[in-house]
Amino acid sequence: MALAIALLAFSGAAPALANGKDISFEADTVSVNDEDGSMLAVGNVQMKQAGMTLTADEVRYKRVDDRAVANGNVVFVDADGAIHKSDMMVLDTEFTHIVAETLRSRYPDGSFFIADSGDIKTDSISVFDGSRFSPCDCEFENGETPIWDLRATSTRHNVETSTIIHRNVRMHILNLPILYLPYLAHP
């Protein structure tokens, strides 16, 4: 079912959900609660806006909060092609601010982040806590171990300057810690 049909039934929330930008939306079922201004999309949910795509098993939008909560097999692809996966994500209605727990991100250059939590801002600085980073273009999610990776308590990725800054970082080679640095920055 297309979002246009669901949003016609959801009338007052349509401008808030799309914020004046075109958004396409598909799901197996969509239900609207007129009392609290919420919408629930369940089953094969797919949302597209400004070159970004979100897929999930379920998305709940609350007009009062002006945010969406996606649950189950959540995959967000940003306009640059970075792929972010999690079991749950909270997004603003323009897809520019995403918060997730247990986040796995793969960037177009093949590098990846895995983090206990991530606060992604698609147009500025993203923060990954309990992070693991490697430029290795390997199938990490399928059990392949990178030759080396960096593990940090906190990592900041600045999209504008293409800079990555790690705090309390340990370099691991073949899963063995070999070097500790309180601070490390790289492109």
Language model region names:
Residues 17-187:
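Structural signature for solvent-exposed beta-strand/loop edge elements and short helix-capping sites
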Residues 1-12:
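Bacterial N-terminal signal peptides
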